[in-house]
Amino acid sequence: YFRAKSNDGYHNQKTGFCSYFLTFEDGARIEIMNIPEMADLPKKIVRTGYSHIAFSVGSIEIVDALTAELKADGYEVISGPRTTGDGYYESCIVAVEDNQIEITV
């Protein structure tokens, strides 16, 4: 999704730690990490601290198509696609570990 390419990942057999880098066309990267011993406490969609990450995809058509693709793959769409009160065209989905992803033009 979001035209990111994943590396082959890293897995430390001794600790169970795993990580993947997602690299985007412009060179930006995000590292996704997991360690089995971490407590998975319930998360609310509205919360303090890290709440969501937004990706600008360039057009209304791409917002619509990507939202439909994610929904078809089983992700929960919690809003949109729509134009917000402050004029942004967006949708929001709930992704891995209940993290919210906002898809904007």
Predicted regions and their residues:
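Core segments of cupin and vicinal oxygen chelate
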Residues: 1-29
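A short, acidic/glycine-rich surface segment
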Residues: 8, 17, 36-42, 79
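Vicinal oxygen chelate
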Residues: 20-23, 30, 67-105
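Short secondary-structure boundary/capping segments
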Residues: 21-22, 42-45
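Short, solvent-exposed beta-strand edge segments and adjacent coil->beta transition regions
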Residues: 48-52
